[in-house]
Structure formats: C-alpha cells, structure tokens
Design a protein with these regions (language model features):
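Bacterial lipoprotein signal-peptidase II cleavage site
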Residues: 19-30
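Structural motif
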Residues: 92-114, 232-251
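Conserved small/polar residues in nucleotide/adenosyl-binding loops
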Residues: 304-306
C-alpha cells in the first residue's frame, strides 16, 4: 500500500508539472476553465515592437547569481542548454555569466550581454530585478526576462518581463510526500504524533519563500494532521555551511524531517549524516542521500527559455 501511494504521488507530481510545461501546440481548455493557447495564438499576443531575428543571428544571454555548484543556478544553466539543443543554437549563440551579485555588477553584465548582440537576456535572482530594469530601459531592442521578480506588470517597460513557475504547487505535493513519511513514522511507532515536527531551511523571509513553505506545510498537514514546523533562515541563497548548520540545529531541536528553500546541498547532506528524511529542491538528492532522500520539487526551466 505504501509503495502504491508513493507511486501515485510521483505520478501526480509528474502530470502536474507536465501540464504546466506541455509543448502541445493545440488549443484546448484546462479543467479550471482557463484556455491553453496554441503556439500560433501566443505569437499573436507578442507586441509588434518585438523584432523578428533570423535563427543564425539570434543570441540569448543568462545571468546567474552563482554557478553550477548552486542547485538553483545549475537548474537554469542546464535548462538553457536543453533549450539550446531543442532550438538548434550554436555555442556562440548562448552566453552565460555566473557569480553575478545583486549589485551594479548585474547591470554591467546585462549591458555586456546586450552589447555582445544578445536578443534576449535572462537573470535568475530576485535581487537582480532593479538592475535588469535599468538595462531594459537603456536597450529597448533587447528583451529582458527576470525570474522570481514582481515588477513587470507595474513597471510598464515594454521589453521587461517576469517569468517563473508556480512552484508552490509542487511544494504542496512535496509536502504531501513529507506528510506520508511522518504518518508512516507514527504508524510504525518510530515517533508519537506530537513529535511529527518538520524543520524548514529558508534562505530569506521573502514572499516566494514564505508561500512555498506555507504550501509545503499545508501539503504535509493534509496527510498528517499533527504535523508542526520550525523555520530558520540563513539570509543567503547559497551557503553550504550555513544551510548544513541550520539543518543540524533543527534536527538537534527535535525535527524528524527536513526540507528547504535554499540552493546548496548542505541540508540534504546533514540529513544523510543524521539519518533524517529530507525533501529537497531543484535537484534529485538520491545519490547523496540514498537513505534519506524522499522527493524533490523542481521547475523545468527549459520551457521558459524556449
């Protein structure tokens, strides 16, 4: 029964995200009544100010807060490479800048990419937004897309856009998996119901992090009603030592399961060391946590780049 439940949950996550990222070109109605536009219909919504570019002259740029060592940034990098493959772009048509802080360095990187001929430029960190908006104002012929941002609708800059997925939905399902594990631990007598305490390692107390942890907790409570959750912030998107320390502190305080919204492998590795179940983000942690990895939530960002 447990294996069947786990399989059904995995299928639910698969179809949930497949539905968000389907490449089907047919126009249809979703179950919630919203229309899924075909590629042809989407093209009609593109502003006339966006100029068409020949494929062999097209360039795309990506600005990352960290590099491949960050699970979050690596997800963007690998997604862009997947999009490159799908679109048939050459290596010199894809430019990636890594370790670009949430400072004027971001504007400089964006300007350099624009000067290098990029037609579309992505930036992946919340704190990049104001600098990307500045660049968008100075390079009106370049499209700037910012992940996790909030200002595109109000800024009214024609070539500035926000792009991300509703990851809180995936976090809810990941929370269900966590709740199933807690219930299993209670039913087996490993813990009592009042000890079903989750630890959550967050990067910052931003709305994106708070909405994600809230969805995760609601998912867990939908299965394990006695579940409670402790949250700690590292005040950094990527810090292996801080994230590991935060996870260890939560475990030492009585948390029997750990999840995270931070970008390193610190928390999953702490869980494996302490034999505590872990729900991860951005990557599968099965290889580094063969005894403790439960499930991960991840966005297929290649669809955004395409």
């Amino acid at each position: 029964m447990k294996k069947l439940t786990a399989m059904l949950l995995c299928l639910a996550m698969l179809f949930a995200f497949a539905g968000c990222g389907s490449k089907d070109t047919s126009s249809d109605k979703k179950s919630d009544g919203k229309k899924v536009l075909s590629i042809e219909e989407v093209e009609k919504t593109v502003p006339a100010t966006i100029k068409k570019v020949e494929k062999d002259k097209f360039k795309i740029g990506l600005i990352c807060l960290h590099d491949e060592n960050s699970t979050y940034d690596n997800n963007f990098i690998q997604a862009l490479k997947e999009a490159q493959k799908d679109l048939g772009l050459k290596d010199d048509q894809v430019l990636i800048k890594t370790n670009i802080g949430e400072t004027d360095a971001c504007y400089t990187a964006a300007a350099e990419l624009a000067d290098a001929g990029c037609n579309v430029i992505f930036a992946d960190s919340f704190g990049h937004e104001s600098f990307i908006m500045q660049a968008a104002g100075e390079y009106p012929d370049v499209q700037f897309c910012h992940a996790t941002g909030t200002k595109a609708q109000t800024a009214k800059i024609a070539n500035f856009h926000n792009a991300f997925a509703s990851i809180y939905q995936g976090r809810y399902l990941a929370g269900v998996a966590a709740g199933l594990k807690l219930k299993e631990m209670i039913d087996s007598g490993k813990i009592t119901a009042d000890k079903a305490v989750i630890g959550y390692v967050g990067a910052f107390d931003y709305a994106e992090v708070v909405s994600g942890m809230t969805s995760f907790f609601l998912g867990a409570r939908s299965v394990c009603e006695s579940a409670t959750m402790k949250v700690t912030y590292t005040n950094s998107w990527f810090d292996i030592a801080k994230e590991k320390e935060a996870a260890l502190n939560l475990i030492n305080s009585g948390c029997v399961l750990i999840s995270q919204h931070a970008d390193s492998e610190g928390a999953p590795k702490a869980c494996e060391e302490k034999n505590v179940p872990n729900v991860a983000y951005n990557i599968s942690t099965i290889s580094m946590g063969p005894n403790t990895a439960l499930i991960s939530s991840k966005i297929d960002l290649s669809l955004i780049h395409i």
